[in-house]
Amino acid sequence: MSIAEKIKVLIVDDQVTSRLLLSDALTQLGFKQITSAGDGEQGMKIMTEQPHHLVISDFNMPKMDGIGFLQAVRTNPNTKKAAFIILTAQGDRALVQRAAQLGANNVLAKPFTIEKMKAAIEAVFGALK
């Protein structure tokens, strides 16, 4: 069993199409345990019920944005060790710095390639195969 097959991934994005595209990309990389949520509140509920190893979250979402969700994950003792990647359409340096300060493992600009996503994940977990 590859590392990718063992990692539980949570995708959090308010756009259904984005969640589906990202899920397809992760499946191509060998991930099998993929869950998704439509916003940070729903994502946090999933994380507290069943922690995941990797969270990939959009930045701009209703109810709880990616930064708020990151803060919630990092302050919960049961979820704080999860790797966290934020996706953003905004090329905002302040966002990248804030995300890093709060413990994000990476911030990827949209649109991104599957190779960039793979590199961001491998930076945390090592080679996926």
UniProtKB/Swiss-Prot annotation:
Transmembrane segments: none annotated. Keywords: Chemotaxis, Cytoplasm, Magnesium, Metal-binding, Phosphoprotein, Two-component regulatory system. SMART domains: REC (SM00448). Binds 1 Mg(2+) ion per subunit. The modification 4-aspartylphosphate is found at D58. PROSITE patterns: RESPONSE_REGULATORY. Residues 8-125 form the Response regulatory domain. Its cofactor is Mg(2+). Its main location: cytoplasm. One of its GO terms (molecular function) is metal ion binding. Involved in the transmission of sensory signals from the chemoreceptors to the flagellar motors. CheY seems to regulate the clockwise (CW) rotation. This is Probable chemotaxis protein CheY. The gene is cheY.
